[in-house]
Amino acid sequence: MPLTRALATTVHDPDARLAELLLKHADNLRGAYMHAAAAVTARTSGKTLDALRSAGIEALVGDSAGIGASRRLAVATVADKGANSIHYCDLDRWLHWRESWPQELSGLLARLEKSRPAPMYACLGRTTRAFGTHPKVQVACEDATNRGVSAAFRRRSDVTAGSAWLSADGARLVLSRSVELSNATDGEWPAIAWLHDPRRVLQTWCEGLEFETATFHSAEVEAAGGRDEWIRATYDTPASWAHRLGLASATVAAVVRVLGTGETA
């Protein structure tokens, strides 16, 4: 069967922070994927919507019940068009990846497609270096998530990088069983595939999934006196810790729910 590559993504960009890099990499986006779909919030800037369309990305505008539902919508849209090599990636992640590690990103899908046994799902995780570039709250809470997932899968895992790969049958399976409304799909999706066939769930380590958010806040970083100062002021807050700790718990709970007792094959 011929490969039909697609990008599925989600976008919330009221300040048009993504528009410049979207336009810069529009030709690459059109060339890399036969189909691309983005679930876009209603508050996203018209400038970003125009940039998405320039890049050949179908913009599915509307507020869903949560990012989990938005992710399912984007994946379902490209799967319905016949895609059988689907890269899900948060758009800010993808743009930073393309900007900073273009060769790694360009070769990623071919690498996964050649894997044997043929995978249905790949967790696209971060190398030790890439993971360490994130704010302390993100490192601590996502490390806790990944420890829980690793215990369930009995292997080192990183499921919280906002990126994954699905085959056609992997997409059908995940879409038929996924119910999480939040980012807890990070754990739910690979758990669904793992329950079906652990041999067809890959873990891949990527440099380009390093911390991306500062890329889109250059003015704020400068005003704060530098990247470290901006990260500290933005992320090292009680509210941020509460949110991320809650998400860590929800993500591991989703894995336990899918796997039943938490035991695996």
Residue ranges and their predicted role:
Residues 7-34, 44-46:
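Short, well-formed alpha-helical segments that are part of the catalytic scaffolds
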Residues 72-85:
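Active-site nucleotide-sugar/metal-binding loop of Leloir-type enzymes
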Residues 83-96:
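Short beta-strand-to-loop acidic/aromatic patch adjacent to the donor-nucleotide binding site
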Residues 94-130:
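Conserved donor-nucleotide/metal-binding helix-loop-beta segment in metal-dependent transferases, i.e.
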Residues 129-136, 147-164:
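A recurrent flexible, glycine/aromatic-enriched loop bordering the glycosyltransferase active site
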Residues 159-175:
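Conserved nucleotide-sugar donor-binding
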Residues 176-189:
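Donor nucleotide-sugar recognition loop
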Residues 187-265:
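C-terminal catalytic/acceptor-binding lobe
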